[in-house]
């Protein structure tokens, strides 16, 4: 009926095609995505709708069972309030309306049986950067639902902490190109707050904050990128790559956000402050040579 600012079909992602220049894509908040499928007893990897900042309205054609997870958007079924993280049974013709969440960015509408659009390269995910996968749903579109799994849901509701906040602290591992930046730049990254800007999307969160000064001039040859990379363009403000990031890039990556923290990064809406802290798994940062020592080598 209505799709809001941005609604796409997403699953666990498109694996094994980076050598062809095709990224993984998939649900930006993998934790909320997985919870929707667990609530519905769907097989892992079943496709859902990823809804950015609410605004979605759908009407059931035939009885369906659904669940909404992620950003806690106000829900109404035929005008009556409904709960997130809960199994909802929609009779034929029922309308589910999703408002704008107070916090967080992305909500996930799962349906028992999964959204059964044709897969592309083994995935039903829409990659907005590469233009692969199903077209984003439009008003009036009919989305097919796959056969219901044999297993029945074990619970009707799964309590989950709210996603999204005014500030998030994300763990990082330095590198692989932290030596392209001054010591002061690395200290700045690990001690400053960066704000998510409105120019952010599924490709990456563009951040506003202290500029990271380079210790080297010139540019790198293009090299592989991963979700969580903090790439620093010439302007000095980092970009945090998310689900639809490019497969390669030529700007240096000063650090990479730990994969376990990426779901929280994906829920950071414009205006959210991000802080970065060194992951305990990374150990103590090595003592790096000063700029003079590097220049005298």
Question: What is each stretch, according to the model?
Answer:
Residues 1-297:
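Conserved "landmark" site that anchors the functional core of diverse proteins
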């Amino acid at each position: 009926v209505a799709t809001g600012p941005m609604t796409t079909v997403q699953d666990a992602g498109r694996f094994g095609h980076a050598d062809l220049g095709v990224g993984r894509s998939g649900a930006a908040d993998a934790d909320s995505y997985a919870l929707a499928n667990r609530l519905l007893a769907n097989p892992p990897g079943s496709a859902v709708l990823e809804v950015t900042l609410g605004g979605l309205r759908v009407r059931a054609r035939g009885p369906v069972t659904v669940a909404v997870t992620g950003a806690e958007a106000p829900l109404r079924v035929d005008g009556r309030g409904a709960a997130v993280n809960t199994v909802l049974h929609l009779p034929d013709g029922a309308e589910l309306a999703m408002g704008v969440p107070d916090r967080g960015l992305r909500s996930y509408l799962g349906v028992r049986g999964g959204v059964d659009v044709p897969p592309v390269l083994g995935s039903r995910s829409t990659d907005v950067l590469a233009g692969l996968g199903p077209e984003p749903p439009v008003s009036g579109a009919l989305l097919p639902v796959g056969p219901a799994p044999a297993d029945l849901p074990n619970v009707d509701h799964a309590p989950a902490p709210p996603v999204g906040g005014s500030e998030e602290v994300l763990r990082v591992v330095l590198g692989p190109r932290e030596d392209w930046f001054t010591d002061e730049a690395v200290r700045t990254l690990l001690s400053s707050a960066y704000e998510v800007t409105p120019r952010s999307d599924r490709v990456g969160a563009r951040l506003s904050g202290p500029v990271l000064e380079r210790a080297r001039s010139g540019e790198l040859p293009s090299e592989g990128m991963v979700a969580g990379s903090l790439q620093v363009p010439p302007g000095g403000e980092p970009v945090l790559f998310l689900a639809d990031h490019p497969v390669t890039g030529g700007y240096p990556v000063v650090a990479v956000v730990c994969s376990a923290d990426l779901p929280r990064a994906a829920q950071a809406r414009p205006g959210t402050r991000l802080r970065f802290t060194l992951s305990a798994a990374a150990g103590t940062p090595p003592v790096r040579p000063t700029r003079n020592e590097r220049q005298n080598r």
